[in-house]
Amino acid sequence: MSSASVTAFEKEHLWMYLQALGFEPGPATIACGKIVSHTHLGVNMFDKLNRDAFHIISYFLFQVLDQSLTKEVFKFCWPPFDQKSDTEFRKHCCEWIKRISGECGSSFPQVVGSLFLSPGGPKFIHLMYHFARFVAMKYIKSNSKNSSHHFVETFNIKPQDLHKCIARCHFARSRFLQILQRQDCVTQKYQENAQLSVKQVRNLRSECIGLENQIKKMEPYDDHSNMEEKIQKVRSLWASVNETLMFLEKEREVVSSVLSLVNQYALDGTNVAINIPRLLLDKIEKQMFQLHIGNVYEAGKLNLLTVIQLLNEVLKVMKYERCQADQARLTVDLHYLEKETKFQKERLSDLKHMRYRIKDDLTTIRHSVVEKQGEWHKKWKEFLGLSPFSLIKGWTPSVDLLPPMSPLSFDPASEEVYAKSILCQYPASLPDAHKQHNQENGCRGDSDTLGALHDLANSPASFLSQSVSSSDRNSVTVLEKDTKMGTPKEKNEAISKKIPEFEVENSPLSDVAKNTESSAFGGSLPAKKSDPFQKEQDHLVEEVARAVLSDSPQLSEGKEIKLEELIDSLGSNPFLTRNQIPRTPENLITEIRSSWRKAIEMEENRTKEPIQMDAEHREVLPESLPVLHNQREFSMADFLLETTVSDFGQSHLTEEKVISDCECVPQKHVLTSHIDEPPTQNQSDLLNKKVICKQDLECLAFTKLSETSRMETFSPAVGNRIDVMGGSEEEFMKILDHLEVSCNKPSTNKTMLWNSFQISSGISSKSFKDNDFGILHETLPEEVGHLSFNSSSSSEANFKLEPNSPMHGGTLLEDVVGGRQTTPESDFNLQALRSRYEALKKSLSKKREESYLSNSQTPERHKPELSPTPQNVQTDDTLNFLDTCDLHTEHIKPSLRTSIGERKRSLSPLIKFSPVEQRLRTTIACSLGELPNLKEEDILNKSLDAKEPPSDLTR
């Protein structure tokens, strides 16, 4: 290979190495302090002597090799401007290249100082070529990442095979060309983007210049001459606007008020009321010294700053609560919701179906109600002759049927609604308890002085735990409780009504009664308004009572009035419209006489039977029915005895009438005082009343036996009563338990009499006796409002009695009381009665302990009766009265199973009367072995001899 070709190869590769190392001729020339136009750089730069190129190329290669060392070595000679710096520069270059030649060895050419004096020619090109090649390998070795030692060594090894060298050269050239092509591609794209960017910048600048020109054109000219005119014009326009607003101010206020625009944006807080929750208030109070919050209202105005602070605290609390709630977020259970939705839909469909069924059933029920109501009205019309509601309507508006109720509401009623209600139109009158108590004490004081006759006639033995020393105190308690039934005026009216006409005329009893009334009650009660209807009614009732109680000839002297006519006149009173049914049937007299005569015959037959104490009759309840039959018989006998004894003396008669009338005569104001009685009744009084009533019922046999021993000639029914009672003492104990249970059971098969509530005030509701009433109790009520609507299909049981009822064992009132005209046979013997009395006394003393146990061991179902609650006291005193009336009907005989015809043929309840009630209410208890006073018996016998002829006594 010729030297010329080698030199050309080295020159070309030298320039390529320089370009590969990043040599740039322009900046390198400026950094050397040379002029670019005077410096010659390129492939042929060292063909001739070129010191500037030598300085620039050599300094660049040294700087690429080690920049810090280059600055330190050429610190004082770079750039070379003079000869000295040039010489020093050449010296340092020669030394550094010699060290490189020593490192490379034989592969690097020999370094001679003369080469640097004239930098040019083939030798210098050969040296610079190897120097550039060494720097390139160092650069590749230090800066290339994936360069290997083998790749670097290939440049240092001298080629042994020319073909291998040419192949390696071609391979390296191809790779180098690829790299250059990539760089060229990137450069071209960069230049294109640069050209586009330059064009865009130019366009934007041109647009900016155009917009600036437009702004300059739009800016107004600064014409100072017209400025003042414009200001004056604006001021005049503003003044005209203000004048228009002032002129339309009122119209604007009206429009604003209509559109609710007044004070729409006012923030003064005058009409704002802030309610701070308790949670926020507690938190602020705890942090009062940290928050420094002022008052919400200052000088009557709202403090907006405090409100804003409170709102901030509220936001903090809400944020805290939200953070607490977000920790456990709610999970939506779609399966559960779908299941619940399906269940609710099914339930809704079932409810709709049920509603349709109810609508269908409602029509049937309404038709049934209409039919039953028609049957009920028809039934009432058959027995009463008219509809029961006609008795109420038009009589007292307060008891009229109320209109249908309005839908239930929990809102309080207005005053207008309350003013229109029945409760406001007819208010309840509450009596004064103290005045009533004083009146009762006054009445009790008059009756205490007349107790001798009742001590003889009413002295039952006590089967309960009562000692002889406490008998007087207990009897006084009975009188105090049982005489709370009416006003003194009513008692005196009862006295005047019950005394027969011949006794009033022939004895000074009426004067005594009048004096007692005028002295005790003359000034205590207000004058009552005279009612002609009431006076006439009282007169007719008095006439009927006299006709029943006695057959005195004085009634027929100049007065040929039949009992039927008197009773019919009650229904055909000229003062009375026929809104009320006649209370007494037309065949009253025939029923009374037929039933009482049969009862007398049964009494005579039963008196001949001996006393029997059968164990089976004492244990089985149905076997004890004759006891209750004789109970009613005995009540009729007592009634006869009482009316007969009334003839014995003035003092005795006065006492008898006062006490009996306090209990039995119908009173006008008893009902009101009974209903208005306060419910806070003393429970101990009720307990004593019930215990004493039980004593009276159990001791009835002994009491009537003692009476019979003195007055056996008065009535044949007394002896029979003693016989029966002597053999059924234990049966009375069992019946007592059944009666207690039945008194507490509400009977739906009862209909209250017109005067039931009036009589209930004078008769103990806990007394299990024969509560039948006589003709004296029959009256037309003043207050219809206390009628009972608890009637059912069997409600006529109280109006009619069966032929087998206990009244068949009673005694005919007319035949016994009017014994002066008829003389039935008597088989009684005083000695036989006394022997029976002794036997009965022994039998009762044996059973005394059993009676203690039976009365003390009260069943659990009877215990609530001994301690009634205050709420039930009033109801028991009123309603148990009817229950005791129907005890015989419900528990002794199958009255509800009898036919309607049998009930019509039986005795009317209007003539049922039980003086046993009167006697037991005012009884003064005595011990079991105490006998009646013989002196009192003699007094009775003497008075009897004075009043009655011997023929009457033998009857």
UniProtKB/Swiss-Prot annotation:
Keywords recorded for this protein, A-Z: Cell cycle, Cell division, Coiled coil, Cytoplasm, Cytoskeleton, Microtubule, Mitosis, Phosphoprotein
Pfam hit, one: HAUS6_N
InterPro entries: HAUS_6, HAUS_6_N
UniProt subcellular location: Cytoplasm, Cytoskeleton; Cytoplasm, Cytoskeleton, Spindle; Cytoplasm, Cytoskeleton, Microtubule organizing center, Centrosome
A biological-process GO annotation: microtubule cytoskeleton organization
Coiled coil: 188-219
Annotated region (Disordered), positions in chain: 474-495, 789-814, 848-876
Complexes and interactors: Component of the HAUS augmin-like complex. The complex interacts with the gamma-tubulin ring complex and this interaction is required for spindle assembly. Interacts with PLK1, NEDD1 and gamma-tubulin. Interacts with EML3 (phosphorylated at 'Thr-881').
Residue positions, PTM Phosphothreonine: T584, T823
Protein's gene: HAUS6
Gene Ontology CC, one term: mitotic spindle microtubule
Chief location category: cytoplasm
Residue numbers carrying Phosphoserine: S406, S507, S524, S530, S550, S552, S715, S728, S742, S805, S908, S914, S943
MF (Gene Ontology): microtubule binding
Family that this chain belongs to: Belongs to the HAUS6 family.
Ranges annotated as biased composition (Basic and acidic residues): 479-495
Post-translational modifications reported in the UniProt record: Phosphorylated during mitosis.
Protein name: HAUS augmin-like complex subunit 6
Record keyword Magnesium present: no
Protein task: Contributes to mitotic spindle assembly, maintenance of centrosome integrity and completion of cytokinesis as part of the HAUS augmin-like complex. Promotes the nucleation of microtubules from the spindle through recruitment of NEDD1 and gamma-tubulin.
